[in-house]
Regions:
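Structured alpha/beta or helical-core interaction and ligand-binding surfaces enriched in interleaved
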Residues: 1-286
Length: 286
């Protein structure tokens, strides 16, 4: 069971000036033993436990930008100061002048125990840019410099982990809504898709019941695995929402979803959450 609040990604985001509901989106591709996933809508804090479950013993915060923590001159606080405000112990690794001006590289990296990541992403604030990558617990300053060099020289569409033998998962979040991740773990893409289904259903139930949050079960792994086996790209939209039942229409797409792509006229499948029995099922759409 997971808790889904009324301030989650599906609740606070919308599409267009008409503020249409934000769709579930999921795409996955595999190459050379790496899985690359783009998905939405999810806040980093809504996925953090999945990241922790497959990560090395430590995590490097590569980039962190937010308007939630500002100094007296209304400038964003440095990530290390944000971690201190949240009571998260970490090691600060300055990158130096060589990294200045390199797209995606900050002035410093934060390294912390992976189990502290949920405390950092505790839901009380929102990063509009966030990049994380796992590292060994005994990572050296030289290795962190090498990591930063790889991050700064890898193209957006190039595989990253193939150049980083010690890392298992890389996460990048934009607007605390859009998710891009790369992993060596073949089970993580299905876990992300299962979480998205739960987040969409849970946000609808929280709004319906006017409760601060709802508790919903996650689908068993066979449901997202069945979807991924059928097609790599999916879009989802809420259907029926009652206190007993939530349905989500799912349609396969020819390409990854982009903002502006509407849900097709006809769904291919329907995911149904039986709230009272705590079960999920997938059926052909009627």
């Amino acid at each position: 069971m997971i808790e889904v609040g009324q301030q989650g990604a599906f609740s606070v985001n919308s599409v267009g000036i008409e503020r249409q509901p934000f769709p579930l989106s999921f795409s996955v591709r595999e190459a050379e033993g790496l899985w690359r996933v783009s998905a939405g809508a999810a806040q980093a804090g809504e996925l953090v436990d999945l990241f922790v479950a497959v990560a090395n013993d430590a995590v490097a915060v590569v980039s962190l930008e937010t308007n939630s923590y500002l100094d007296e001159d209304w400038h964003p606080l440095q990530p290390a100061l944000i971690a201190a405000e949240l009571g998260v112990p970490c090691t600060v690794h300055p990158l130096g002048s060589w990294a200045s001006g390199t797209n995606g590289l900050p002035e410093e990296l934060l390294v912390m125990d992976r189990d502290l990541l949920p405390r950092l992403l505790d839901g009380t604030w929102s990063p509009y840019e966030l990049s994380l990558i796992d590292v060994p617990a005994d990572v050296t300053p030289e290795q962190l410099d090498e990591l930063a060099l790889v991050l700064g020289t890898t193209g957006v569409d190039e595989p990253l982990l193939s150049r980083l033998g010690d890392s298992r998962v890389w996460f990048s979040g934009h607007d605390d809504c859009y998710v891009l991740l790369e992993t060596r773990d073949p089970a993580l893409p299905a876990a992300v898709l299962a979480r998205l289904l739960s987040l969409l259903a849970g946000s609808a139930l929280a709004e319906l019941t006017e409760e601060p949050f709802s508790r919903v079960p996650e689908p068993g792994p066979w449901i997202p695995e069945q979807l991924i086996a059928a097609a790599p790209h999916w879009i989802g939209a809420l259907g029926t929402v009652t206190e007993d039942l939530v349905t989500i229409g799912l349609a396969a797409l020819p390409d990854p979803w982009r903002l502006g792509i509407s849900f097709p006229q006809q769904a291919d499948l329907t995911a149904t959450l039986d709230v009272r029995h705590g079960t999920w099922r997938i059926t052909p759409a009627e």
